[in-house]
């Protein structure tokens, strides 16, 4: 059971790291995530959200 938990935590951490690395910040200022959707689609990404006043785009959810 301990081995299963260790593997599960390791996979979770790796998936979080991969998800962060795949994201891309684009030079578009925003106040809400809705403002980023079109800009992220034009940049070739699927999803976008506003973080710290700039659009952060990711290829998957």
Curated annotation (Swiss-Prot):
User: Which cysteine residues pair off into disulfide bonds?
Assistant: 30-50, 36-55, 40-57
Q: For this UniProt entry, which residues form the secretion signal? A: 1-23
Provide this UniProt record's keywords sorted from A to Z. Answer: Amidation, Disulfide bond, Ion channel impairing toxin, Potassium channel impairing toxin, Secreted, Signal, Toxin, Voltage-gated potassium channel impairing toxin
User: Can you tell me where the transmembrane regions are?
Assistant: none
Q: Which residues carry this modification: Lysine amide?
A: 60
Q: Give the InterPro entries listed for this entry.
A: Scorpion_toxin-like_sf, Scorpion_toxinS_K_inh
Location(s) in or outside the cell: Secreted
Mind naming one GO cellular-component term on file for this protein? extracellular region
Tissue expression summary: Expressed by the venom gland.
Which Pfam family would be a valid example here? Answer: Toxin_2
The domain of life for this entry's organism is: Eukaryota
Job of this protein? Inhibits voltage-gated potassium channel rKv1.1/KCNA1 at nanomolar ranges (IC(50)=90 +-2 nM, reduction of current by 30% at 50 nM or toxin).
Q: What is known of its domains?
A: Has the structural arrangement of an alpha-helix connected to antiparallel beta-sheets by disulfide bonds (CS-alpha/beta).
Task: State the family it belongs to.
Answer: Belongs to the short scorpion toxin superfamily. Potassium channel inhibitor family. Alpha-KTx 03 subfamily.
Name the UniProt record assigns to this protein: Potassium channel toxin alpha-KTx 3.18
- Source species: Mesobuthus eupeus
Task: Tell me the lineage of the source organism.
Answer: Eukaryota, Metazoa, Ecdysozoa, Arthropoda, Chelicerata
């Amino acid at each position: 059971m301990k081995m299963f938990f260790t593997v599960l935590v390791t996979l979770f951490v790796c998936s979080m790291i991969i998800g962060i690395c795949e994201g891309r910040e684009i030079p578009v200022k925003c106040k809400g995530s809705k403002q980023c959707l079109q800009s992220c689609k034009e940049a070739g990404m699927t999803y976008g959200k506003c973080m710290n006043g700039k659009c952060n785009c990711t290829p998957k959810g």
